[in-house]
Every structure is written in C-alpha cells, then in structure tokens.
Amino acid sequence: MKDINRLKIVLVEKKRTGKWLAEQLGKNPSTVSKWCSNVAQPDLATLVKIATLLEVGIQDLVISAK
C-alpha cells in the first residue's frame, strides 16, 4: 500500500510517541500504530484532532499526491 500519511514522521519531529497520541485521542495504541505504518488511515475528524494536538496543519500530516 502506498503511504498516505506522514504521522510517524511528524510524531518523531514533535518528539511524541504513538502511545502518547493514543492516550490523547482515547484510542487503542494498536490503532495509532496502524495509522503510523499506513496500514489504516484516521478519519478526517480524527486527523483534525491530531493536527491540533501536534500543533501542525493537516497538510503536514498528509503526503501530497503530486
């Protein structure tokens, strides 16, 4: 599967972990792990929450289709 999000990269840049993000969102850490490895994708509402928590724009979390 082609990578769609940059969540793993942004977490590293912000010095945060998937476990931290899961706790903030009230999600299972395995769900966040799937997002980080691009096995699954968060819905748009969750993506907005993630962007807010990490203090980045949504565009920073998504890989451009160029």
What are these regions (language model features)?
Residues 1-17:
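A short, Lys/Arg-rich alpha-helix, primarily the initiator
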Residues 13, 24, 53:
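Residues within the alpha-helical elements of helix-turn-helix
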Residues 15-16, 42-45:
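Residue-level signal for the short linker/turn that defines the boundary of a DNA-recognition helix
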Residues 21-22, 50:
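Short alpha-helical "recognition helix" segments of helix-turn-helix
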Residues 26-42:
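Recognition helix of helix-turn-helix/homeodomain-like DNA-binding domains
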Residues 36, 54, 62-65:
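DNA major-groove recognition helix of helix-turn-helix
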Residues 45-60:
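DNA major-groove recognition helix of helix-turn-helix/homeodomain DNA-binding modules
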